[in-house]
Amino acid sequence: MLIIFIDADGCPVKDEIYKVAERYQLKVFVVANKYINIPANERVEMVVASSGFDAADDWIVEQAGPGDIVVTADILLAERCVKRQVRALGPKGVEFTEDSIGSAVATRELMQNLRHMGEMRGGPAPMDKKDRSRFLGKLDEIIQSLKRR
């Protein structure tokens, strides 16, 4: 059964995921280190992971399996998921695959080093309507491909 896991701390597309999951009648686990308000829906479940480092990520990796979807902006979590044949999707609609995850990890490390050296400040650009639209389209595409299996 296809399940969507949300790495929920700071995820900007939770509402969009809830709507898509409702349309397809899918189970959603909202995973975070602290309680987050979720819709009153029997298919949406809040999981508060322990407060340990990467506890939410670890829970997601342990629970998600092939045929599931993880929505995360955390590239290292996406890498762990891809290695387990779990579909990983970023909140801006970029799917992490076996072919793309290596360069995503390398880019993350480069940006982290540049920030550490003071060469760069700030983070990614804020979400806009195009990002949300791209995310919804890609999520729908992934769900359709998994349902055809």
From Swiss-Prot:
Short name of one Pfam family for this protein?
A: DUF188
Cited CDD domains: PIN_YqxD-like (cd18720)
The disulfide bonds in this chain are none
Query: Which superkingdom heads the taxonomic lineage of this protein's source?
Result: Bacteria
Q: Which residues form a coiled coil?
A: none
Per the similarity annotation, which family is this?
Belongs to the UPF0178 family.
Q: Which NCBIfam families does UniProt cross-reference here?
A: PRK00124.1
Protein name (Swiss-Prot/TrEMBL): UPF0178 protein Bd1212
In its UniProt entry, the species of origin is given as Bdellovibrio bacteriovorus (strain ATCC 15356 / DSM 50701 / NCIMB 9529 / HD100)
